[in-house]
Amino acid sequence: MENRWQLMIVWQVDRMRINTWKSLVKYHMYVSKKAKGWSYRHHFQSRHPRVSSEVHIPLEEVKLVITTYWGLHPGEREWHLGQGVSIEWRQGKYRTQIDPGLADQLIHIYYFDCFSESAIRKAILGHRISPRCNYQAGHNKVGSLQYLALTALIAPEKTKPPLPSVQKLVEDRWNKPQETRGHRGSHTMNGH
């Protein structure tokens, strides 16, 4: 019988970012209690040798599973020492992978208080609205002018420590495109 390969999208992440993610998840599960219903699985609770941890986030009948890996092949940079993250959507036997932005939006919708586009209409009609958004990572696009006015009126509180963001976890801070400096500021262009 031939080997059967499965392809997974694994985001390369440095070790310190994964450690920060794990700490934030545990803090908000056990101390602040903002991550109610989440479950954390340690590496020794998994049968797969490369799984470092799993965070199971229930969304009604669906489950979001964020898995961190170690011992993968080294990445293209020396700080990518074989660490990675996958984000999976599970519903019964159906499984698919989703991107970090969508994961943050789903977590935001199900777990954290927020005033959204419906709040604009409620505010105009004079109804009482939720005063602020607790999970800013869930807003990945610029809102309407009314929404921006509401956010300017009611500034979001900074939570210490911040809520765990999947997008922040997989963000690539080293491979951002280099900005070229002007002729005067570039040493290589001047030949000095």
Curated annotation (Swiss-Prot):
Residues 54-72 are annotated as: Interaction with host APOBEC3F and APOBEC3G. Residues 171-182 have a biased composition (Basic and acidic residues). Residues 151-180 are annotated as: SOCS box-like. A motif (BC-box-like motif) lies at residues 144-153. One of its GO terms (cellular component) is host cell cytoplasm. GO terms for molecular function: metal ion binding; RNA binding. Keywords: AIDS, Host cell membrane, Host cytoplasm, Host membrane, Host-virus interaction, Membrane, Metal-binding, Phosphoprotein, RNA-binding, Ubl conjugation, Ubl conjugation pathway, Virion, Zinc. Counteracts the innate antiviral activity of host APOBEC3F and APOBEC3G by promoting their ubiquitination and degradation. Acts as a substrate recognition component of an E3 ubiquitin-protein ligase complex: mechanistically, Vif hijacks a host cullin-5-RING E3 ubiquitin-protein ligase complex (ECS complex) and the transcription coactivator CBFB/CBF-beta to form an active E3 ubiquitin-protein ligase complex that targets APOBEC3G and APOBEC3F for polyubiquitination, leading to their degradation by the proteasome. This is Virion infectivity factor.
